[in-house]
Amino acid sequence: MLWMKSWFETRWRFLFVLGFAAFQLINVVHHNVPDQPFAVAKLVYPMSFFITIIGIMLGGAGINTQVAFRAIKGLHGSMYFTLALPVSRYRLLATRAATGVLELTAVIMLLCAGLWTTVPQLRALMTLPEMLVYGFALSVSAASFYSVSVLLATFLDGQWQIWGSMIFVLGMQEVSERLPVPHPLDLFRPLTTDSPLATHVLPWSGMGISVVLAAILFCLSMKIVQLREY
């Protein structure tokens, strides 16, 4: 029941992100010249931007109604239904966050499979399983940005949550470019220069840092959820 409720409250953002992924795929295919060598860098950086955006969008969908903070316009029945459920806020938030992670992973995997299928040069560079491993690395590396969006969604609504997440992530990127951030602590490297698409090696340190940071941010989100009144 909770999983179905999470899906109903996130499905429109998921479908929008899926359409965004289709546009990204069409754009890559349109600008690709099959007879020329494939420039990996031209794909890695747009992909990192795309992954960050969809992580932010999927992270905040349905958080407030899922944990019954307030009745948002058009979702009043959802809030009252949530209040009637004999479940804890921790379970509500965990289910909602897990739903978003699954949606994020699904979009990334579909995009990677689509790129491998439609770009001949990629098929020459790697196999489909290797491309899906690249998608897995992207999903794990995006977990920290996703968790930032979840955290902000616990006390911000709609567009404020999206803009707040974008400003925070852009600020992190600016700091990583201007300050000597240690290589393993740079959250953007696994999506760009250390991407398996370029190195053919999984960025284990970057992925590990992303998972640890995501866990910390989720714990903070849970604390906020437990302290909020409705």
List each model region and its residues:
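Aromatic- and glycine-rich beta-strand/loop motifs that create alpha-glucan
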Residues: 1-21
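Secretory targeting signals
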Residues: 25-29, 40-47, 94-162, 205, ...
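Terminal transmembrane helical anchor/hairpin motif
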Residues: 27-44, 153-155, 162-230
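Long, hydrophobic alpha-helical segments
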Residues: 45-69
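Hydrophobic cores of alpha-helical transmembrane segments in multi-pass inner/ER membrane proteins
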Residues: 52-61, 143-147, 206-221
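Transmembrane helix boundary and interhelical loop/hinge segments in multi-pass membrane proteins
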Residues: 60-81, 97
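Short helix-to-coil transition segments within interhelical loops
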Residues: 81-89
